């Protein structure tokens, strides 16, 4: 899991810390996840990956929130509740190709823009998330 990035100079911080840590990071991640699934739910460009999800996105929203909180360096909410994420195994039932990966990234980048993420932070976060999304490909 990634949770550290290079800041200007040699200072290192987690994405969670850069999002505001305990004071604001959790809320920012929650808002990001809500925006992400809102994009997926309403944007026709994301229709194919939306179809991979249940009609009710409540569980998906909560699980992604818990996962991203820990993945960014915050509390390990997902692991505490469900154990190791085993992302690839959990996604094997779905046909995930380059198009699905790109749709997922499209939703995430739109959500980051909607939430007003700093450009530099957004770029670094998107680069790391792309690696995770690409790892999910099984076709």
Predicted ranges, named:
Residues 1-139:
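Core of compact, soluble alpha-helical bundle domains
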